[in-house]
């Protein structure tokens, strides 16, 4: 069964609200922060401490790499990650 090019439809673009990354980063960081505070305040959750600290550190590392790549894309570096046009300021 062959499908001709004229019959293939492109999927619709995602709504802009689903392309925003900063709310996802904020919610994830807040969730790890709440879990870390709970792990250090509630004695029964002491076994969570290493996991929550690792979660905070991993989130911080990932956010740092994203911001670094965003800065590289803004200045037009050749090695910058592709596809960050959504986050660049129109100048």
UniProtKB/Swiss-Prot annotation:
It holds the Pfam family DUF2530. It is found in: Cell membrane. The chain crosses the membrane at residues 22-42, 53-73. The keyword Transmembrane applies. It is a multi-pass membrane protein. Its main location: membrane. Signal peptide: none annotated. Keywords: Cell membrane, Membrane, Transmembrane, Transmembrane helix. The keyword Cell membrane applies. GO terms for cellular component: plasma membrane. This is Uncharacterized protein Mb0903c.
